[in-house]
Structures are given as C-alpha cells and as structure tokens.
Amino acid sequence: MGVSVKPAARRNARQFALQAIYSWQISKENVAAIEEQFLTADKYDEEEHHAKEPKLQAPETDVAYFRDLFSGVALNHIKLDGKMRPYLSRPLQDLDQMELALLRMSIYEMMNRDDVPYKVVINEAIELAKVFAAEDSHKFVNGVLDKAAPTLRKK
C-alpha cells in the first residue's frame, strides 16, 4: 500500500460507515444501493452547511475502509451479533439501532482489522457514540467492547 492513511481519514470512514450501517438496518435496503447513495451524495449536495462536514472521498476519507466496514458488517451481521451477545446486559432486540450499528461495526473491526489496535477501536466507538447515539450510550458501548476485546483479539 505504501501510502499511510491519516487517522482523520479513518475516523471519517468510520463515521460514514456507521451512518450507512444504521441506514441499512432501518431501511433493509440493498447494501450496494446504500453504498452508492453515500458515495455520490457529496457530488450533488454542496450546500453551505455541508462545507464544514467531511466528504466521502479521498484523501479526506479512507473510502476503502468505509467500504470494508460497511460491507463487512452487512455480510456478517448475524455472526457479529453472536459475538456480542454474551457481553450485552440486555437482549439484542432491545438495543437502540445506533448502538447496534456501532457495536456491529466495532466488533467487525476488532475481528478483521489487526492493523488497528483494539484500544483505538474502542476509543473511536466511544467518540462516535457521544456524537450519534443516546446520551449515555458511550458508557454502554465502552463496557461491551471492553469485555469483548480479550476474546476477539489475542493481543
């Protein structure tokens, strides 16, 4: 790969992936259609209030990472749910959809992205929960991921 990816580009990729996963969970729409909506949205949406928001394009966002997280979660959500279930304090169906999307994405990342330290995955999940999820969701997400990490990573 040669070129190192900036942490901000990965952070933006996670943010877009989380939103895409959430959209997929709610709409049950085709994964490719949702991905296409996200990848083409900025080309048509150049309003002033969007000027400060990150764009889903390189180099600002790691587009390949976005695609990996989104498609990885969509293709493996049943397996991911099974991996998180032992660490949940309530039934899976009682989780907020944003919490579920965030936990699925983070568990996928821990299991499949050895290039990212698990503490980075947890920290990024906490920060995303603070922005996108309910008020105390970041504490719940942190607790689940902290308990799950040792079994998902052998490091």
UniProtKB/Swiss-Prot annotation:
Recorded GO MF terms: RNA binding
Q: Report the superkingdom from the record.
A: Bacteria
UniProt KW keywords = RNA-binding, Transcription, Transcription antitermination, Transcription regulation
GO terms, biological process: DNA-templated transcription termination; transcription antitermination
- Asked if the keyword Ribosomal protein belongs to this entry, the reply reads no
Q: Which InterPro entries match?
A: NusB-like_sf, NusB_fam, NusB_RsmB_TIM44
> Tell me, what does this protein do in biology?
Involved in transcription antitermination. Required for transcription of ribosomal RNA (rRNA) genes. Binds specifically to the boxA antiterminator sequence of the ribosomal RNA (rrn) operons.
The family assignment reads: Belongs to the NusB family.
Q: What is this protein called?
A: Transcription antitermination protein NusB
This chain is encoded by the gene named: nusB
